[in-house]
Amino acid sequence: RDLRMSRGLGDVYKRQQYGRLPIIVGKRSDGYCVSLESFAFQKLGYSTYKELRPGEIDMITADGCEVLSDGDESKMHICSFMWTYYGYPNAVYEGVTVETMRTRNGEIMAENDIKNGKLPDVDYVCGIPDSGVPHAIGYANRSGIPFARPFIKYTPTWPRSFMPTNQTMRNQVAKMKLIPVHELIEGKKLLFVDDSIVRGTQMRETVEFLYENGAKEVHMRSACPPIMYGCKYLNFSRSTSEMELIARQIIDEAEGADGIRFIDEYSDTNTERGKKLRDEICRRLKLTSLEFQSLDGTVRAIGKPQCELCTYCWDGKE
């Protein structure tokens, strides 16, 4: 676990031994601060001083920042989903900016569709606000299809939709935040990019929302592979069971108790099982077409060695 504690003349900070989340130290002329994300202190006049290594322990005093334990860079296993979804756009983790990664990720998805003959004939590429937007911009830039915003996010009073503990409230928050631009929806063929497909309930409502507003076709691209496991390290997910995940529900229905043996095949949409999973999710969400970013594509977009990244929610590897 990450740790903060007071110790006499200073505060002591420790980054978790595998560095699953960052700890960033900021500095200005009159002192230091510590945050999960650098943008949190930039408006206060601090600049990034350092990122703690996995397991590193520092003490901040009136005299400066002292390293009490060096940590071990070789144990790095930072959460990949920080770039795909959770991170703020201008946050920088291990030298990689979130917005840059997302744009590059969209470009890779478009390249894959072009290479595999799956680039659809649509009027616009669009992103599910907020985190889906830069993925979509990258896809639009690489594919040559115009980018548009057929619905706008209304943010006052509404939190991020994954935060409420109740699924009904999560759906309500997601629905209330989106306001349609009818001219960009009615009679149009649209390709949307979202950061992920977890349970599928909010996605289903978004697709229905688009059809109700006159969309002719709704294609979807997921900016990461199918979610196969709930996160057991950072407590990000509100899921109480992996059977809440739409991918696991479909696998369980198809394979029963043996389904866990075939997770790797289902995770890869190039395999027969992977294609069946993709097609069934596509059918349930009433999409015209659906493709997932591959794990390899996600890692390429981040630009770090896979051995330094936690990909547990996709492949179950610890």
What are these regions (language model features)?
Residues 7, 17, 27-30, 53-64, ...:
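Short acidic-glycine loop/turn motifs at beta-strand connectors
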Residues 15, 45-51, 205-318:
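PRPP-dependent phosphoribosyltransferase catalytic core
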Residues 31-45, 59-121, 159, 163-170:
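Active-site-facing substrate-recognition patch
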Residues 118-131, 219, 290-293:
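Short glycine-rich phosphate-binding loop at a beta-alpha junction
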